[in-house]
């Protein structure tokens, strides 16, 4: 049974710049989540990377490939890794070209790393991942069909990499109502988002109380734990 989900997005690994700094931060992150998850079994942990693992679309380098695959391999030792693509991981205007994540997945050939590319519902133990795939224009998966197939006793978690109406950027720009509305995620119990680098949180149905300790963690840049 999955008991803990670690959520990160917008890693933006460059082709060769700042790799020493990236690796130092990655190692700190891995050490932190390893300590946090020490009371969980490997199969109880999921690490969700919600788009933009790399930065320069399909321009990749040997250095980038080495660092990216090292990061994914180390994460997979903590728990199963779930990845979706973001706008920096592919050419949106030419999807016939291979994206930058696929070669890593093929080379790693790791059963503890899953790469979801379709807008559909993926069963994973007691969780159903509802992927709004960028390869299919962030189309809403058929969550109703997924619930009929997999049951309502699962937790349905959306994966989405694109702006949301009402989200704000670090410079204060707010995305207007022409962008995706929260009802696009109807049927999901929660949604893990990527793309906008300023951390935001939306509550569509009921308000969640956050204690002071949680709030201080939430305000920081970095990663989030969902239990």
List each model region and its residues.
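His/Asp/Glu-rich metal-coordinating catalytic cores
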Residues: 46, 58-209
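N-terminal active-site segment of His-dependent metallophosphoesterases
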Residues: 1-71, 149-152
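Low-complexity, intrinsically disordered short peptide segments enriched in small/polar/basic residues
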Residues: 2, 140, 154, 214, ...
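Binuclear metal-dependent phosphoesterase catalytic core
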Residues: 120-123, 207-222, 226-227
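Hydrophobic residues at beta-strand termini and immediately following loops
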Residues: 8, 132, 213
